[in-house]
């Protein structure tokens, strides 16, 4: 039997030859560098009719095919266990920009936030500001914290003494410098550039807690505020800031049959530089995604539904736990993703014991009638691009958080056991490779966000740990 060094050299040469003949030049360069394979050996194998000295250099694929044929029965059984998704539905990868997960992507710990935050505190919300310079955090004990990433300092204040409730939602008003605060009493508060409450800038939008909120820029000084609450209403409001004065006008509302589970907004360009908006909402015990259009900049109109089950007689087969709008072809620098043929929705389901992800096509027809009866709303049953199982464990109480990191080419899912990466091309899912000092991120994820510049992510757990992770692209 040949010694290990000879067999290793020959194996490396087989692999290098395979990479070269299949045009995988970048992978070949990395392989040669990491194995220290002499380039001259590869060149000699080409110039000597696939011989290395007197040793014939076989084709790697032929070697593998022969091996499979020799042990075809055991290989057939073994292949069944390699993936939980043997036959994924075909999808136009080029159209939707779907690529394999970027395995060169790495993460490093920036700082453990606990050291500069109130001790023994569970944070229920963590959001980057629009300029990615600050992190806005809300705790279960009533604290609001503004963390300065560059200075590694934090400022906190007991907001519940002023708003008389724990803050559930906390985030930026686009790039205006203003922030919003939504405590659990259904109110909407404004904070100024110094993160202080603005006088006379509080509005009761919902009778009960606001569960979901989206802010969409209309003009330089006005924004749509789209909210859903525990009172089962979807509401559209207009926030205006003029000469230091703030106004919020309630425009439209729709009563929902059950509580909202996700809320997304997509901008529809009209070709004249103006945007209209489509609101995509899911709710409990309803396996459809409902689309509402904002008509005449003031009215919410139910435009269509997208069914996630094929049974037209049933609208409930599982719960939709989270939805995220993505576009892997066009980079998005605005606060609202734009509609294009490559835009799609990623849906996390309630299937047990393992979550499923569904990729959904969005209809391109944006010309909706101004009035439409509910029984005439069109339902699409042919918009599912891919429906696949994951290895993400969950139970009846799981609340997954979906996130998109552009350089990853895939989807991040914060769940009961940590943060998972999901490869949309292969359906592969696995716990994210996070440095050892952040082991607590393998607990239940309570909050997670990715900075606008895509350079950092923040995640907090049920064990009261919270971390900033640096995103290292094209790591070698």
UniProtKB/Swiss-Prot annotation:
InterPro entries: LisH, UCP007778, WD40_repeat_dom_sf. Residues 7-39 form the LisH domain. GO terms for cellular component: cytoplasm. One of its GO terms (biological process) is regulation of biosynthetic process. It comes from the Eukaryota. Coiled coil: none annotated. Present with 1280 molecules/cell in log phase SD medium. This is Uncharacterized protein YGR117C.
């Amino acid at each position: 039997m040949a010694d290990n060094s000879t067999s290793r050299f020959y194996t490396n040469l087989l692999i290098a030859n395979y990479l070269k003949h299949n045009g995988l030049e970048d992978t070949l360069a990395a392989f040669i560098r990491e194995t220290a394979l002499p380039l001259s050996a590869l060149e000699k194998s080409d110039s000597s009719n696939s011989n290395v000295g007197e040793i014939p250099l076989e084709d790697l694929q032929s070697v593998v095919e022969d091996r499979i044929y020799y042990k075809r029965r055991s290989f057939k059984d073994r292949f069944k266990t390699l993936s939980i998704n043997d036959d994924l539905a075909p999808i136009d990868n080029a159209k939707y920009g779907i690529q394999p997960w970027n395995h060169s992507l790495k993460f490093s710990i920036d700082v453990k936030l606990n050291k500069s935050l109130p001790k023994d505190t569970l944070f229920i919300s963590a959001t980057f500001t629009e300029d990615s310079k600050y992190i806005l955090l809300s705790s279960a004990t009533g604290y609001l914290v503004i963390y300065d990433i560059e200075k590694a300092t934090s400022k906190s204040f007991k907001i519940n003494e002023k708003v008389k409730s724990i803050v559930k939602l906390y985030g930026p008003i686009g790039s205006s410098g203003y922030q919003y605060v939504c405590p659990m009493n259904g109110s909407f508060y404004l904070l100024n550039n110094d993160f202080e409450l603005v006088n006379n800038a509080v509005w009761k939008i919902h009778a009960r807690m606001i569960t979901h909120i989206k802010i969409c820029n209309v003009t330089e000084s006005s924004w749509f505020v789209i909210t859903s609450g525990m009172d089962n209403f979807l509401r559209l409001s207009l926030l205006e800031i003029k000469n230091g004065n703030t106004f919020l006008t309630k425009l439209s509302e729709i009563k929902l049959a059950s509580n909202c589970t996700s809320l997304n907004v997509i901008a529809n360009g009209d070709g004249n530089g103006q945007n209209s908006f489509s609101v995509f909402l899911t709710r409990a015990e309803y396996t459809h995604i409902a689309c509402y259009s904002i008509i005449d900049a003031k009215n919410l109109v139910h435009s269509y539904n997208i069914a996630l089950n094929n049974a037209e007689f049933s609208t409930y087969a599982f719960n939709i736990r989270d939805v995220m709008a993505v576009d892997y072809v066009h980079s998005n620098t605005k606060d609202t993703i734009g509609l294009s043929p490559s835009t799609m929705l990623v849906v996390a389901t309630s299937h047990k014991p393992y979550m499923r992800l569904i990729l959904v096509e969005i209809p391109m027809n944006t010309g909706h009638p101004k009035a439409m009866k509910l029984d005439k709303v069109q339902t699409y049953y042919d918009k599912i691009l891919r429906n696949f199982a994951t290895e993400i464990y969950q139970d009846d109480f799981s609340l997954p958080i979906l996130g998109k990191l552009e350089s990853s080419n895939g989807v991040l899912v914060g769940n009961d056991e940590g943060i998972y990466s999901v490869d949309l091309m292969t359906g592969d899912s696995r716990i994210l490779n996070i440095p050892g000092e952040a082991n607590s991120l393998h607990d239940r994820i309570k909050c997670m966000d990715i900075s606008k510049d895509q350079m950092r992510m923040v995640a907090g757990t049920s064990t009261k740990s919270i971390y900033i992770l640096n995103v290292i692209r094209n790591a070698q």
